[in-house]
C-alpha cells in the first residue's frame, strides 16, 4: 500500500508491534521516516507515524504513566503545526476498562486544552473508539448501550467539538453510511456496510 504513495504523512494506531521488531529499511526505502511508540505489553496497542517530511520534534506520550505504558499518543512537530496521533482506549472488554476509558478521556481533554496554548495549530487524528452521531453508526438504536456509542462517550465528543475543533471528514461529507470500522467476525458485516465511524482527523480552527 505504501508503494502507491498514498500520503506524505501517515498515522497508524493499534500497531501491536515493538519498534525493535520492525524492519525499518522497508519504510526508509520508500522514502518514509518511521516513528513508533509501543506498549510495554507485547502485541498490544501502540501507534506509529510514517512521514516523508522529517519532523522538527517528536514527543512520545503525554506524561500520563498508564497511557504511556500502553503506547497511546505520539506527537510530531512540523514548523508551527503539531500532529497528535492517538489511539483512544476501548471499553468493550468490561466495566474496568470502560471506567479507565472515561478517566483517560477526561485527562486527555485537559491535556489537549493545555497543548493548544502552546500550539494553536493542532491536528489530532486517530482511532477514538467512539461514534459521535447516529449518522456515524449503522444501528444507533441497537447500539445505544454499547461501548463506543454510550451517551457519556458521545457527550465527551460534543464537548470536544464545542472547543473549536473541526471534524474534517464531516466538513466535506455530510452523507450517511460512511464508516471507518467493521467487525471482523462475520464477512457479511463489511459486505453489508454495517460499520462505525470511530476514526477521525480533527483540526483546530486556526488551521
Q: Positions of the model-derived regions?
A:
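Metal-dependent phosphoesterases centered on the DNase I-like endonuclease/exonuclease/phosphatase
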Residues: 2-11, 30-33, 106-198
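Short secondary-structure boundary segments
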Residues: 14, 172, 205
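Structured beta-strand-rich core segments of catalytic domains in phosphoester-bond hydrolases
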Residues: 14-18, 22-92
